């Protein structure tokens, strides 16, 4: 099985360059390919006809990594998110005309850029924290282009709300955001301490607004997520009720994949492809 699967994977044109192998170096979870990349690929394919109506189609990935991953337990490597997205866009007949990729580590950005160019993409790269590079990324989007912002930070600490606010200024932009439930659930009670600030950029002012006298600690993560969603809606976006729950294969929730847009068509398409065993969160609000 592994042999057959590896034969279908496009070889790495730069095997000597950095490869993402997860925080412990043993490989990323299989859910990265089976869930995160699969949903992105299905969305790009399902929206191909709508995308063709735009002369310029841009992917924005401010947490791009090196563009190549190794899944735990596999001997071979695979495309990272931005490279996989570009290949899917080509296969679907509506290739991205420009990819804007960024990472805090220059070597990882350079590796991603080279791998994308090897696949035939037009790329512009940015080095630095996403909350700093996103302004330049926004300016690099051609006027009137359709943009897809793929926001995939390692944890909630780096999901600065200012990233979303700045990208929201674009005329045509849809978002696919990985919201770290694991980080939120594990640490929100500690973050109530005003001396700590890990979540302050993700949802400014949350600590003062949190109804700690009314909610149990176990209810705080749901309140935080709901309040974050309302902040996104206040920017003029509709959040899809279908939010795939990404787990680690051991029953532990890692992310919610949150999609939001201003136009009803991409929202309807996302709902169709993401509808599964995942619960519609907004049914309970």
Ranges and model annotations:
Residues 35-136:
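SAM cofactor-binding core of SAM-dependent methyltransferases
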Residues 171-186:
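Conserved beta-strand signature within the Rossmann-like core of class I S-adenosyl-L-methionine
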Residues 2-57, 74:
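Class I SAM-dependent methyltransferase Rossmann-like catalytic core
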Residues 133-142, 165:
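Short amphipathic alpha-helix with an adjacent loop that forms part of the alpha/beta core around
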Residues 156-170:
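A short, conserved alpha-helix within the catalytic core of class I
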Residues 264-285:
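Flexible, glycine-/basic-rich loop-and-beta segments that form/coincide
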């Amino acid at each position: 099985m592994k042999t057959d699967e590896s034969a279908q994977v496009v070889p790495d044109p730069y095997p000597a360059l950095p490869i993402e192998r997860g925080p412990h170096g043993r490989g990323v979870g299989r859910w990265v390919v089976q869930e995160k990349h699969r949903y992105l690929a299905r969305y790009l394919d399902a929206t191909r006809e709508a995308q063709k109506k735009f002369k310029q189609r841009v992917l924005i990935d401010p947490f791009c990594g090196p563009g190549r991953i190794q899944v735990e337990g596999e001997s071979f490597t695979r495309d990272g998110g931005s490279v996989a997205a570009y290949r899917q866009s080509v296969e679907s007949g509506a290739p991205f005309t420009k990819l804007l990729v960024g990472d805090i580590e220059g070597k990882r950005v350079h590796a991603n850029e080279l791998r994308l160019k090897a696949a035939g993409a037009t790329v512009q790269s940015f080095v630095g924290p996403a909350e700093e590079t996103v302004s330049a990324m926004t300016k690099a989007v051609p006027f009137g282009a359709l943009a897809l912002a793929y926001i995939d930070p390692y944890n909630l600490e780096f999901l600065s709300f200012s990233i979303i606010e700045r990208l929201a200024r674009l005329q045509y932009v849809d978002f696919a955001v990985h919201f770290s439930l694991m980080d939120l659930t594990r640490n929100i009670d500690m973050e109530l301490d005003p001396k700590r600030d890990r979540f302050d950029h993700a949802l400014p002012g949350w600590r003062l607004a949190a109804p700690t006298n009314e909610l149990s600690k176990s209810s705080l993560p749901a309140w935080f997520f709901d309040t974050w969603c309302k902040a996104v809606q206040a920017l003029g976006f509709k959040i899809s009720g279908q939010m795939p729950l990404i787990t680690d294969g051991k029953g532990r929730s890692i992310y919610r994949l949150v999609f939001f847009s201003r136009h009803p068509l991409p929202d309807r398409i996302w709902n169709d492809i993401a509808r599964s065993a995942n619960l519609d969160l907004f049914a309970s609000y």
